Amino acid sequence: WENGHWVEIPAMSIKREYNFDQVGDKDMYLLHHEEIESLAKNIPEAKRIRFFMTFGQSYLDHMRCLEDVGMLSTTPVNFNGQEIVPIQFLKALLPDPASLGPRTKGKTNIGCIFTGKKDGKDKTYYIYNVCDHQECYKEVGSQAISYTTGVPAMCGALMLLTGKWTTKGVHTVEEFDPDPYLDALDKYGLPRSESHNPALVDLSLIHI
């Protein structure tokens, strides 16, 4: 999202390396994610909203190989007299994600970097969480990807049940008071860290 409109680029075409606290240097890719849509709608004064996600080279190599041989296709094909969808067949062959918890190691780092003005002064702020896969498995029997999905949803439900958020209708999280929500995340396993001088992502090579 840039200057009031959507910008489309070829998939996985923009890569940047970033040093993540407790995780280290990782390649991350500019891509679409659904929260950009509600943020652009609810914060119209935002000039730019971007989302990056990290992928290892081995993962990307496997995905490209599967794509090249047609295993990521959603178009049905006939095999031995039966119609199958390649990607659905692939899913049946892959391990259940829930079974990966015991052997998943390392940490996740999920956060947001904001730049703008506050009280007339330029300000940069980085809020993030670091979550350990093995610690999550010890606590709830899942890895950190599931943990960092489930705990925020639980905290959102807690805000509704305790009356912290009372607006009627269908809303997204950025429309509510963030303070009690962030406090709940701190309490229930996703404590925040912050920096007022983070390294910014170099986007100077992107031409729109």
Language-model-derived ranges and their functions:
Residues 1-205:
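C-terminal catalytic/substrate-binding lobe primarily of soluble NAD(P)-dependent oxidoreductases
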